[in-house]
Swiss-Prot record:
Its main location: secreted. Keywords: Amyloid, Calcium, Lectin, Metal-binding, Secreted. It is found in: Secreted. Belongs to the pentraxin family. GO terms for molecular function: carbohydrate binding; metal ion binding. Signal peptide: none annotated. Residues 1-30 form the Pentraxin (PTX) domain. Binds 2 calcium ions per subunit. GO terms for cellular component: extracellular region. This is Serum amyloid P-component. Homopentamer. Discoid arrangement of 5 covalently bound subunits.
Length: 30
């Protein structure tokens, strides 16, 4: 899991976190 989002999206469950990571990663062009 991206450590960059550890403090941002780790508040959500794993499934929700995965969805958010995908969206955030896409937004950051990561």
């Amino acid at each position: 899991a991206p450590q960059d989002l550890s403090g941002k999206m780790f508040i959500f469950p794993q499934e929700t976190s995965t969805a958010n990571v995908x969206l955030t990663a896409r937004s950051q062009d990561f």
